[in-house]
Regions:
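Propeptide (latency) domains of metzincin metalloproteases
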Residues: 227-228
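Short acidic/polar, Gly/Pro-enriched loop/turn segments located at secondary-structure boundaries
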Residues: 46-221, 237-256, 339-340
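A short, acidic loop/turn at secondary-structure junctions
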Residues: 10-46
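N-terminal export/assembly leaders
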Residues: 22-27, 257-346
Length: 346
């Protein structure tokens, strides 16, 4: 198979993919939990995009790159290049001295590194102080860069916590309400309980649900959002404005400002919990930020105009970063290099 891909032709306008190539493309796209995408349509979109580029300038850069290995598949598709207002070098910086780990901190104690990425708090009991009052002892679960975790809360709600994220809840969870605080990104499959509303607090908004599946992303200095997969939720902004969401909708907010609701394909937003990077028509700056967070590597845009290049990008999170860089270098209208814990785009 490796020999076949070494012979892979990049001139997509002259032929359609073979049956085996279509199969690998489906694998790369990663849609195993629902019907496979229309590979022919994807191929035609790619060919159309290539046809809009000057052949002499982009012949070596505009291509589909595929690599099939025992447990690694990457798929990158160059879609569009939009002008932007950046005129200086831009960078996302790695965190020095970081270790890849998941920690659990009980109340004000010292964080404890756990050896598993699957945590079970379903046996957590409510405690009282000497006066017989319910305590509010905190439990904090934190993931470092390059690590994610799955946990079961006391009521049976399942949470996936993405890299560099934190979730906090107290012993009072489930008494009247089920409340958690999230920084970073988390996906929830909420146990249905109409008597105890489920509430997620972030620095930018509060989400209230009864029983549903949704994704919350609230990293510092990034656009925050809620993506609803099923059920119904109520999102309240920092200024008190409220939006009711239906399945297949996303609510975005910039630094806790005005919220905007629109329809979206929820699939790309939740694939991280299944071990994939999945971006669809996403600016290269956002993609590189996520890669930098996962691999804890510096990202430097020597050519800031590349930040708004849109890509369709899929890769397993176990993929070697060097392979990802090689694939990006083949498709963007520029150059990508890696060395000394730094990826440079120019």
């Amino acid at each position: 198979m490796k020999e076949e891909y070494n012979k892979y032709k990049t001139d997509t306008e002259q032929r359609m993919p073979t049956e085996e190539e279509q199969h690998l493309l489906r694998m790369a796209i990663g849609r195993t939990s629902r019907p496979a995408p229309d590979v022919e349509a994807e191929w035609e979109k790619f060919a159309e995009t290539c046809g809009k580029q000057p052949v002499a300038k982009h012949k070596k850069k505009i291509a589909v790159w595929m690599a099939a290995a025992a447990a690694a598949v990457a798929f990158v598709l160059y879609l569009a290049n939009r002008p932007d207002g950046f005129d200086k070098q831009e960078a996302f910086i790695a965190v020095k001295g970081i270790t890849h780990e998941v920690t659990v901190q009980e109340d004000d104690g010292k964080p404890t590194v756990v050896k598993t990425r699957q945590l079970d708090f379903s046996r957590t009991t409510h405690t009282k102080d000497e006066a017989g009052n319910m305590t509010a002892k905190k439990t904090v679960v934190t993931t470092s860069r390059g690590m994610d975790a799955q946990m079961t809360l006391p009521d049976g709600t399942v949470v996936w916590l993405n890299a560099e994220s934190r979730i906090t809840f107290t012993d009072k969870y489930g008494l009247e309400t089920r409340e958690v605080n999230v920084e970073g990104e988390a996906y929830f499959e909420v146990k249905k309980d109409t008597d105890h509303p489920f509430i997620v607090h972030t620095p930018y908004f509060t989400t209230k649900v009864l029983g549903t599946s949704f994704n919350v992303k609230a990293y510092r200095q990034q656009t925050a959002h809620v993506v609803l997969v099923s059920g119904k939720v109520e999102v309240t902004g920092k200024e008190g404005d409220t939006l009711i969401m239906s399945p297949g909708e996303i609510v975005n907010t910039e630094n806790g400002g005005d919220m905007k609701k629109e329809r979206t394909d929820t699939y790309p937003f939740v694939q991280w919990k299944d071990g994939f990077f999945y971006f669809d028509r996403t600016p290269l700056a956002d993609i590189m930020r996520e890669l930098g967070r996962w691999y804890n590597i510096n990202i430097v845009f020597e050519n800031p105009s590349l930040m708004n290049v849109n890509l369709h990008f899929v890769a397993e999170k176990t993929q070697d970063i060097n392979d990802i860089v090689k694939s990006l270098d083949k498709v963007i209208p520029g150059k990508v290099t890696i060395g000394d814990n730094e990826i440079t785009l120019y």
